[in-house]
Amino acid sequence: MRLGFSAVTAAVLDVSAAFRLAAELELTFVELSCDLREAAPVLHEPALINELRSATGIGVTVHLSSVDLNLASLIPAARRTSIDRTLRGLEFAHTVDASCGVLHTGLSYLPHPQAEALVGAALQESLSELVDSSVPIALENLCLTDFDFVRGARELRELTRRHGLRNCLDLGHAHIEGVREANDALGDYRRTLGADVVHLHLHDNDGLSDAHRPTGEGTIDYAAQAAFLHGFDGTACLEVTGGEAGVRASVAHLRSLPTPA
């Protein structure tokens, strides 16, 4: 796997410092945040990012906006804003030559069968406006709350393939889903999504809350995932809290996992 880290989750907001840390730890990429780009553009200047990429040989991935964004909204103005923000994020990702853009799928706040059909149609329409992106879009598994519209691996696969997209497999999210449903959700996502998974989000938790702890500090059995991780040829982002120390600890932990025979 090609290992990198999320600068915003680790609270390394100085992009130059993020690239220095990635270079020191011999990581492959830094994951940038479109939410941060929108809120504080000076922190994610494309010209500086491209200078850093050229100087270090370190690439980037982009987490497309998720704050106050809902591609499945039943409110036309809210959904239009969400689409436009995502399109601007994809333009930013193209400018910095991101290898992929991670995207959340959408929320449904009305637990009613008629509303569910309308929400599904709204999400399909939103995604249809994104399919011409020059940057691969990786739909992420969520299923953390009752409001997350896409439920489980099969729904995510159907949505992904209908629009010719790819996937980001978040191990922490899958772990929470598996604990809640008392099943092997992580294994199900791996088997069901298969080669559509081009990007990983790696972090840890207790199976109850999405804490984004450094890997090895929760209840995810990373040793059981060692063969999968070693054989994965996409990008794998450490989406961990704890600042630089959390990133360092996670890198050391993952590199200590046994190499399959």
Where are each of the predicted segments found?
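Short low-complexity, flexible loop/linker segments enriched in glycine and/or proline
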Residues: 45-48, 76-78, 117-118, 154, ...
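Histidine-acidic metal/acid-base catalytic patches
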Residues: 2, 16-23, 98-99, 150, ...
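A cross-domain feature marking catalytic cores of carbohydrate-active enzymes
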Residues: 5-9, 32-36, 62-66, 103-105, ...
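Alpha-helix-loop-beta-strand connector modules within alpha/beta enzyme cores
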Residues: 49-65, 122-133, 161-163, 222-229
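Acidic-and-aromatic substrate-binding clefts and catalytic sites of carbohydrate-active enzymes
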Residues: 8-15, 33-47, 70-73, 108-113, ...
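Active-site acidic/histidine proton-transfer and metal-coordination neighborhood
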Residues: 72-167
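N-terminal pre-domain/capping segments
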Residues: 1-88, 94, 166, 257-261
